[in-house]
Amino acid sequence: MLRRAILPLTRPSGLVSAPRLSALPVSHSRCYAKGSKPKTPYKLPESVKSSKPEQPAKPSQQEQYAAEQAEFETTSDPQANTANTTSQASSSPESSPSQSEQDAPQRPLPDLTQGIPSTLAAELEARSKKSGSGTLNLTEDPSRFEEDYSDDGRGDIPKGGYESSLDRKRARMAKLMYALFLLGSVGGMAYLGRNWDTVEEENAHPDVPSGWSFGLWYNRIKARMGDFTSYYKDPAFPKLLPDEDPNLRQPYTLVLSLEDLLVHSEWSREHGWRVAKRPGVDYFLRYLNQYYELVLFTSVPSMMADQVLRKLDPYRIIRWPLFREATRYKDGEYIKDLSYLNRDLSKVILIDTKEEHARLQPENAIILDKWNGNPKDKTLVALIPFLEYLAGMGVDDVRTVLKSFEGQSIPIEFAKREKAMRERFEKELAEEQKKRPRSGMGSLASALGLKSSARTLDGEQLPSAGLQEGKMLWDQIRERGQKNYELIEKEIRENGEKWLAEMAAEEEKLRQEQMESMKGSLTGFFGGGKKE
């Protein structure tokens, strides 16, 4: 510590040893200044002169201000107490570009440790300055678009001036693909237009025979393309109903629709979906079952219509149900093509509520109004006498009879015709009885209380006996139909529950068999089947 304190004291002082300039004589100082002055004056370089701004020459005399200065008066207008900035700005010299750049605020340098900064903002700013528009084209104005993006981002490069190797490769691949597609199309058309391979194909298209003309070639292409799309448009099977012996079934086929004919479905917020059964449906089906082969043909999908059919016809009075899968799709409509039924169309009657469903066979159709849920409707019951007459009288072709009722209400018109025929029949019967002499044996037997046998072995009345009693032929047919209907109703009342139980057991048995077959197929697939 003592050494550090003594060390500054031992150092020599500069102020004491340095000679004092003021002590030198004046003559020596003048000689020094005279000797150090250069003989030629020093001139500044031109670069330094140009960099320094020229200072305006100072006025030789100071400006004389007026004794009275209006801007400092307190009583004058405040607006007049302002300096004339415009005059000062005009009188002051313009600032140089270097000075404006120095006065501009300096932006911070980018931090390159965070990556190279984006130049998008600078490019957009330069583009906007070049185009003369300082705002973005938010409204997508076409004029602004052409003005701002007329160069397509290429700048001074012309449109076809540069093409990369990748673009050339893509262009070659595109040309190759187009060529292959064209060759494939031509080859495919030529293959589709070839002659028929088998006799079955040629018989299936009788209007398009084999040949090498352009028209036949085009027709075969069209026919084969139609075969491809027919899988989705035509019915699922070429024969919707199986082949049966005509002696074991009714000779006539009655095809019925479901929606708005037998049932009516509606939706409401309070009850949701509800399905109502039309009045007289049970009587209609059970009565006509003895004359017709009943077929349900609906455009509703099977998953929806099958549940309704189970409730509508629990005793399987309807023999064959057909759903949307059996219809034909054409021009946006589901058509019921009766030619797929595998039945003679002269003995087929279709009852529907839409004319579009019977577009292909309108001569076989009876179009009724849609049932809207009226509980007092009697349309189906009123149609029974006409249908019973067609089947009971054995009409050869139902289409001719239906054509005679075209444009008229069938129940009303048939009632008028039946009344006219009954009046004529009664008149002819009365005239015949007057001409026919009464036999003596008949009068004697009636007097003794004996009646002649005018019935068959099964208890049915002979037609001739019925005619003598004044009954028309279809009156006798109607009586037999009523008796058969009563027998059917009696069987349903006595054995209906038994039939339902048997059908439920049969369905359960089929379901169990299907489950067993599915389990066996799964275990066999994974190698767990039974070893023989």
Curated annotation (Swiss-Prot):
Pfam families: NIF (PF03031). The keyword RNA-binding does not apply. The chain crosses the membrane at residues 176-193. Residues 26-163 are annotated as: Disordered. GO terms for molecular function: identical protein binding; mitochondrion targeting sequence binding; protein transmembrane transporter activity. Residues 1-32 form a transit peptide. GO terms for biological process: protein import into mitochondrial matrix; regulation of mitochondrial membrane permeability. Residues 247-390 form the FCP1 homology domain. Coiled coil: none annotated. Residues 61-106 have a biased composition (Low complexity). Gene3D superfamilies: HAD superfamily/HAD-like (3.40.50.1000). PANTHER family: DULLARD PROTEIN PHOSPHATASE. Component of the TIM23 complex, at least composed of TIM23/timX, TIM17/timQ, tim50 and TIM21/timU. Interacts with preproteins in transit. Essential component of the TIM23 complex, a complex that mediates the translocation of transit peptide-containing proteins across the mitochondrial inner membrane. Required to direct preproteins in transit and direct them to the channel protein TIM23, and possibly facilitates transfer of the translocating proteins from the TOM complex to the TIM23 complex. This is Mitochondrial import inner membrane translocase subunit tim50.
